[in-house]
Structures are given as C-alpha cells and as structure tokens.
Amino acid sequence: MSEIQSVIAREVIDSRGNPTVEAEVTTLSGTGRAAVPSGASTGEHEAVELRDGDKKRFLGKGVLTAVKNIETVLGPAVLGMDALDQAELDKVLIQADGSPNKSKLGANAILAVSMAAARAAADTVDLPLWRYLGGAAARVLPTPLMNILNGGVHADNGLEIQEFMIVPYGAESFAEALRTGAEIFHTLRGLLKKDGMVTAVGDEGGFAPRLPSNRAALEYVVRAIEAAGHRPGEDVGVALDSALSEFYDAKTERYTFDKQQKTREEIVAIYDELAKAFPIVSIEDGVAENDEKGWRLLTERLGKKVQLVGDDLFVTNPARLAKGIEDGLANAILIKLNQIGTVTETLECIRQAAEGGYRSIISHRSGETEDTFIADLAVATNAGQIKTGSASRSDRVAKYNQLLRISYALGDGQVFAGRAPFRRPGAKRSS
C-alpha cells in the first residue's frame, strides 16, 4: 500500500515571485505534495539550491533544471520504494546526487521529493503529518518568534539587524500567544503611522520603516508591547536575528553596525548592553558564520543569559552542529529544511541538538510558499519554538493557521512551550 507509484514535479512561484520546486509523490493509497522555500540571507555552507541561470527567463532564477532532475533522475530512483521508510528513501536521493552539498541535482529538487514522500506516507497510513513524523509523543505547540520589524537584506531601510521579533511566552496557549502577537503587530502599525513612518511590510510580513538605529527599532518594539497592554519581559520577550554575516568583512575582521565599523569585541559589548536595556531572550547569528573568535566571545559573555542561535553557523548540518557543540559555540540551532535538503537529515540534526543540550527553532525562509510542513515538523519534534514571520502575508499566516488546527486536534493533550525554551542557567526568570 505504501509503494511509490509516481513522482511528478513542477515549477511554481514563491512569496517573492521567484520560481521554486514543487513535487508530488503518490503511493498505492496516498498522495503528498510539497513546495520548497528559498532564503535571501544564505549561509555559505548550505546545501546548494539549483537555479537555471537563463537571464531571459525569471532573470536567471528559473528551476526547470531542478524539475527535470526530479523527472529523470530522482523520481525514477525512488519508484517502487516504500514511502514509509523515509531514511532509506532519503539515502537513495542523496546517493543519486552524489555531491557533498547536493549541488549536482539541487537541494531544492531533493527536498521537494523528500517532503512530498513524507506527506504521501502520512496520507497512506491516514495520519496527519505531525503525528506520522512525531508519533504518540508529539504534543508541544511551539512558542512563536514573530518577526514584526524587518531590516538587513529583508528590507531596504538602513538597519543591519534583519529581524526584530516578539516572543509571547507568557500566554497560556498557542492560540493566546498568536493573538498577543497579532495585537502587538497591529499596535506597532498604529505607532509607526502616527509617527509618519512607512507601514509597508518586508519579505516576512514585518514592517520596514527607515529608522536611525537598531536601538530605535527595539524601542518601537517595546513601545508596541506596552501599548498593546502587555508587559515587556513578563508577558512578551524580544528576539533578534542579526544575520551579521551579511555585514562582516573577513579581511578587516570588522562589522558594519549602525552604519559604523565595529570590532567583534564592540559588537558583543553592544549585545550585552542591549540585553540589559531590553527584554532580549534570543539572538540569532549575532556574529558572522566564520568568525569563530566572535562566537566564542559572544557565547562566553551571554551564553548563560540569552539563547544564542546558530543559523548560518550550523546550516542545519549535523557535522557542523557536532563541531559547534564540541567547541562550545552558541547554545541553540535554527532548523531550516532546505539548508540540508532532506527530512531525515533535518530530524537527525534536531535529535543531535537535543542530545548536546541545544535548543532547536524550526524556521521558515524569507522566500516562502503556502506549504505548512514546518508547522507539522515543529509539533512532531516538540521543538518548542517556531520562526515563521509576522501576523501578515498568507505565506506566513498559513503556518500559524496549521498550528491552530493541530492545537484543536490535540485538545487537552497539548502542551504550550511558553517560557520553557528560554530558561537558561544563570538567567533571571520572570516571576
């Protein structure tokens, strides 16, 4: 019943209007479809996303080559396989590519088939994806890290920090956390509009006003939390995705921050100061992916007080994560399916993080689709945290709505992660 009968692929459009890959896998009694996302700020160690490069078509960003690779190589490779054996299926996909970074056939092609096969398997056994992947233990609804103010490469507004997020960890349930986030989002819109700021949104649904400094952005976020009737640090925390690899000069070992050149020591000192002035509970990619000295310094200074997330540092790669754990860099990992390219490797990375005492945050990409796989993955793995944008743009809201559906399905059996992921040894806890 779970034998794969067909694999088809097509080119579809993502939330930025760029092509991406969608695959559909059919077994004797089930079907699964999946579309892969794409990032704007990408780590240099990520699995390779294959683009056509034909400037006459989608400005070179077409994915017909990746689609063809599914139709002629990857699809035939898994025909007749048992969709219920995800590990073996992903092994075959990886072997078909044969390169260390999935550059031959494309991580976007491989992941589309991997995700679609998982969905087909779940459909075959008549289970929701989150239950199929997570089993009976899947019951934790994640605390959302909601990106309400954008900067960096996600917005042309002069801010280096890429995401200013709110973390409604004081809520009693996921539904209440989502409501809290939506209220703060709309309140921020009102504050910005009142001050004559632009209220257009960036790639991930957050506002992208032109502000004088990163600190000014944080001040707006805290004002919005308070104006919405919530207590900063008690009901709602703040998280940052600095994505500072985009603003690092490896030759001079200097960062651009607030339009000034800074050393790694100065950058870490800035974070230390901001963490004292604002209720910051998480900092992602606070220094560049290849700045090991910076990561050591940041972890030594703030690792016992704040969640330090490696995104570009680890790129959802078990080998890079293992080295990071051994070296004591960061204390959490961002999980992006398309950084590594298969469901199995993603699950392995989450398991490895847990064994090493690192938290996992399931994440979207700036170029998204209506696909809700990451919502199911967050619950399946009891990760406890999810990053999937603001309370706007249907490509972001789709994930939140799927989490609401899962919440209703779990009923009294669900647990909301709340503050738990952010409690660290040495950190001051909210009363």
Swiss-Prot record:
One of its GO terms (biological process) is glycolytic process. The keyword Transmembrane helix does not apply. PROSITE patterns: ENOLASE. It catalyses: (2R)-2-phosphoglycerate = phosphoenolpyruvate + H2O. InterPro entries: Enolase, Enolase-like_C_sf, Enolase-like_N, Enolase_C, Enolase_CS, Enolase_N. Its EC number is 4.2.1.11. This is Enolase. It comes from Sorangium cellulosum (strain So ce56) (Polyangium cellulosum (strain So ce56)). The lineage of its organism: Bacteria, Pseudomonadati, Myxococcota, Polyangia, Polyangiales. The gene is eno.
